[in-house]
């Protein structure tokens, strides 16, 4: 068993084997305190084999579990463009302050804040169980999406290496797949994905909503930064794989200026992204509290504005969303993007107890279903040419 020497209460280190993807900062609470090393987990996690810590993942505990099943059926009536998902990890050390999968961690008796970032459940037998499930005569080979709830290429994947087995199992069974991630560790699996694309439709999406490195480091501290993700998009395109981008969330007053949007869409076009969907920050319960604490600490002058803009709900005002959709359309056109693509791992929860597990109408302005074709899944028309629109720059609504 991996990390045998690092089980809690026996914290030896296997640094060489750890993921090379280094986070820019450690897990931080919104009050600015670095997360303390967690106490040994004594939670009644189903299938828990053991809990592991290591200094290379300071403050993070991995709970290795054996899963009975890894294929999740999306709730009936969902607006998501796929029926099945796999989440090899629960919780995510990418630690995005705005992550709206946070609430799902409470179903495991963890909290939606620091625990989501630092108590990561790892389904160590995911590939093996998946092969069994895919071999059932009843399996109809519908598309399976990875990255719908938490990031499958978060840092732990460098160590646990669950994704290669999952990709192989899906492709070998003739099941189309799509992946959404912020993790540059995906580059490791490009050859495998290229091969899989000769067997089944394969879609790849990168989540990137800002080019400001400093802002990214503050709001998504465990992720590879924007430059690294842009490089990943280029590598995917060079490998002949399509690469859509989820430009969500656009953060009011922080990443929604014309300069920021121009830089974002221009950079995505230059990197060769095949499509992009963009939308405003969505603050569902569990995320809202965490994000508002962060805003109050990092940008206290914006705290009141955010409160008024969201009015205690999950969505920015209709007026703001309409304004942002217009700016997005303008800058997409300027940089040659047509239409939109994809889905977001921030945009769906898998737990049936969550009534908001359904893709919330209007939460993804302009988004469209992924349309698969062999080797082109997830792509939409990006002409790559800067179709310059002459629309004058609109002023932000004055409401806020
Ligand atoms: S938004 Fe995605 S990458 Fe960020 S913490 Fe959530 S699941 Fe991880």
Predicted regions and their residues:
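Short histidine/acidic/glycine/proline-rich micro-motifs that form metal-
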Residues: 151-153, 250-253, 314-315
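Conserved strand-turn element in the central/C-terminal portion of the radical SAM core barrel
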Residues: 211-215, 219-222, 235-257, 281-283
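Active-site glycine- and acidic-residue-rich loops that bind
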Residues: 184-187, 251-262
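Conserved Radical SAM active-site core
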Residues: 50-90, 97-205, 209-217, 226-234
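A structural motif
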Residues: 174-175, 241, 273
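Auxiliary Fe-S-binding modules of radical SAM enzymes
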Residues: 1-66, 72-73, 258-400
């Amino acid at each position: 068993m991996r990390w045998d020497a690092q089980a809690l209460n026996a914290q030896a280190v296997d640094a060489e084997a750890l993921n090379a993807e280094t986070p820019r900062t450690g897990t931080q609470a919104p009050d600015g305190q670095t997360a303390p090393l967690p106490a040994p987990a004594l939670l009644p996690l189903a299938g828990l084999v053991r809990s592991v810590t290591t200094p290379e993942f300071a403050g993070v505990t991995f709970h290795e579990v054996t899963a009975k099943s890894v294929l999740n059926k999306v709730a009936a009536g969902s607006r998501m463009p796929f029926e099945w998902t796999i989440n090899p990890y629960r919780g995510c050390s990418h630690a995005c302050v705005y992550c709206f999968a946070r609430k799902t961690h409470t179903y495991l008796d963890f909290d939606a804040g620091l625990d989501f970032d630092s108590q990561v459940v790892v389904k160590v037998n995911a590939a093996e169980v998946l092969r069994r499930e895919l071999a059932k005569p009843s399996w109809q080979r519908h598309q399976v999406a990875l990255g719908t709830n938490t990031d499958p290429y978060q840092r732990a994947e460098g160590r646990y290496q669950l994704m290669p087995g999952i990709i192989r199992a899906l492709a070998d069974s003739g099941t189309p797949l799509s992946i959404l991630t912020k993790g540059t560790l995906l580059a490791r699996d490009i050859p495998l994905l290229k091969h899989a694309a000769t067997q089944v439709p394969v879609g790849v999406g990168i989540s990137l909503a800002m080019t400001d490195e400093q802002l990214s480091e503050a709001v998504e501290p465990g992720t590879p930064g924007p430059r690294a993700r842009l490089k990943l998009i280029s590598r995917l395109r060079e490998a002949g794989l399509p690469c859509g981008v989820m430009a969500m969330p656009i953060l009011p007053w922080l990443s929604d200026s014309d300069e920021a949007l121009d830089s974002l869409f221009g950079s995505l076009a230059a990197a060769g992204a095949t499509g992009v969907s963009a939308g405003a920050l969505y603050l569902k319960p569990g995320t809202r509290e965490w994000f508002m604490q962060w805003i109050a600490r990092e940008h206290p002058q914006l705290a009141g504005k955010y409160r008024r803009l969201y009015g205690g709900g999950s969505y920015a005002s209709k007026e703001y969303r309409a304004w942002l959709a217009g700016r997005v359309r303008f800058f997409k056109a300027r940089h040659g993007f047509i239409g939109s693509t994809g889905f977001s791992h921030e945009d769906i929860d898998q737990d049936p107890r969550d009534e908001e597990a359904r893709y919330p109408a209007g939460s993804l302005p302009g988004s469209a279903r992924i349309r698969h074709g062999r080797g082109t899944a997830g792509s939409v028309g990006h002409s790559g040419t800067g179709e310059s629109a002459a629309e004058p720059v609109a002023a932000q609504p004055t409401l806020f």
